[in-house]
Amino acid sequence: MFSILNKLGIIWLALANISNCDNSKSGHKSIPKYNVKYYHANIPKDFANRFVELNDKIVENGSFEILGIDGQPSKNQYLCFTPNPNTAVNVSIESAQRNTRSKEIENEPKSEAEIIQRGVEMIEKSFSRKDCVFAYGSNGGYWTLGYCYGDKVVQFHENLQHFVATGKHKPEYPDYIYVLGRFKGSSKKPTNLDNQSPWASNNLDLSEFTIHESSIISDATAKNEQSRFLQHTLYDGEICDLTRKPRSIDIIYKCDPNHRGRIEILDQQEIKTCVYQMVIGVPKLCSLDEFRPNKVEDQIIDIDCKLIDQTNKVKADKLSYQDFFYYTDDIPSDNKIFPIPHSYKVSLNNYNLSPCGHGFYLGQSKLPINSPSVYFNFRHILVFNDQYHSSSDLLEKLGKMLKVCVGNKILSPHIENKRQSLLSWNDTFILWFELYDFYGSFISLVKVSRDGSKEELELKLRLINPETMLDQDGDLVKVPEFDAPNNAWNFQKFSKGKGSALDSTNNDKNNKATAENDKQYQSTSTDIVTVTVTESLETTSSEDGTEEVSNEMVILKKLADKLGMTDINELHQAIEDLDIELEVQHDEL
């Protein structure tokens, strides 16, 4: 079998790229899909070679192959066993839900108009004409989106400091709230962030809705899902500077199986100039069989790949192919400097991945982990699906991602009303993540520190080698002792509000014994990369003492919006490089 592994291109998470067709509809047998599992098993090199020599004798069972998973033969090599798909055990996706739903639909046939009516009724019951639903951090944190039922859809630049302090949304520039589309009969009052709907009821016009179906791959588990959604197009938005036509937006209402009991804006994109699409998860739609994802049964074949220990010189005696399966993970171990070694590799299809922006995903294990390391059993990981050219480049990308996720995506260890609260800029914390690429290969440890007592929205970031505990500058970092409040094992320290958890160890009498050891790190640790995530504009003081945005920065803001640039400073630098002088006239405003 040269080999299914090579045919897959060694892109293990790309199960989504392996056929996502619903073959059951055409009457054909489902195409096998491959679920690659990694084990840090340390098989001796000679044993690995002997397993490969067994291939001619085990054709009915499958085949072994030695592969440099990352495309670098000299780097980490794995011994992989690919079962013969004709004799492999059929590990199928449970399809009882699909069969039950299919029978219900067969017994109760419904027209498209009936399905639309039922779906729209759920939408009408879900929304309030008094409130708006917001999503902070769209387009890399540049826009905040607002969906106001019965009124409008808007995007605006968030006043981040106000949001952090109050939890309420406020535009940085009140005159620049862009309306992407309006409901029919909506208010023509000057636009603000309130729901200004004049409607007397929640009733929608059924003729404005269309129903669609889409095939998607759920997570990385090779589940084909046929999903229905309702589309509603809103017109009459702000005039677009480029097309000179009103903006419009397609609203996609769907059942999100991973919903958290509340309506959420799941996605928004500009599909062409000044024409947008917004996807909204409506939990009540999940109560209708017609809108729940239709899971299709597939044949899943596991491919086991186990790390080869190139330094182990033990010679193999007599082997059978079954011996391969007795080699399991021999790490993590608390006996190491850090529980995770630099050579570690994860099977990303074992993780639920939640997008964080800028190519980063937050990963949580789907199944319980039972290892000697309690840290390893409960921690979350970061996954990066992009390229970087240097450690400073990677740190910059991390900073941009965290700017969006702190206060919006990452949960803190604090429990409030039986629910975990979001990590806030007012919190003080030391947070650790293992960072992996989209092959599942380890990149670096990431240490994130925040002092919530500071007004500046700053984070201190370090990239650390877990085997040497040296950071990107070669400075030694102390091996952490995790407080892990409420079993949140990514948190070394945490203090809710504007405390100073970073210095809390000074008051811990149990740490007196380690005081001498701490000194060695003080002498070797120097500069730490600091990422400032505020993007303040130049201001001038008016006669009454209030601050106003300078005319120059307003012009830059307008230019950046028209050019589609997300960083005003980048535009400013480009102008300086071209030796162009900005002349601001009052009548230009």
From Swiss-Prot:
Which UniProt key words apply to this protein?
A: Disulfide bond, Endoplasmic reticulum, Glycoprotein, Lectin, Membrane, Signal
Asked if the keyword Signal belongs to this entry, the reply reads yes
Chain ranges for the short sequence motif Prevents secretion from ER as given in the UniProt record: 586-589
A molecular function GO annotation: carbohydrate binding
Cystine connections: C132-C148, C240-C274, C255-C286
Cite the residue spans of the region called Disordered: 497-520
Q: Which Gene3D superfamilies match?
A: Mannose-6-phosphate receptor binding domain (2.70.130.10)
The UniProt entry, under SUPFAM superfamilies, shows: Mannose 6-phosphate receptor domain
Binding sites annotated in the UniProt record for a mannooligosaccharide derivative: W143, Q155, D241, R247, E270, Y276
Q: Primary place of residence? A: endoplasmic reticulum
Give GO BP annotations, semicolon-separated.
Answer: endoplasmic reticulum unfolded protein response; retrograde protein transport, ER to cytosol
Asked if the record carries the keyword DNA damage, the reply is no
Function, in words: Lectin involved in the quality control of the secretory pathway. As a member of the endoplasmic reticulum-associated degradation lumenal (ERAD-L) surveillance system, targets misfolded endoplasmic reticulum lumenal glycoproteins for degradation.
User: What is the protein name for this chain?
Assistant: Protein OS-9 homolog
Q: Which organism is it from?
A: Debaryomyces hansenii (strain ATCC 36239 / CBS 767 / BCRC 21394 / JCM 1990 / NBRC 0083 / IGC 2968)
Q: Organism classification, top ranks?
A: Eukaryota, Fungi, Dikarya, Ascomycota, Saccharomycotina
Primary gene name: YOS9
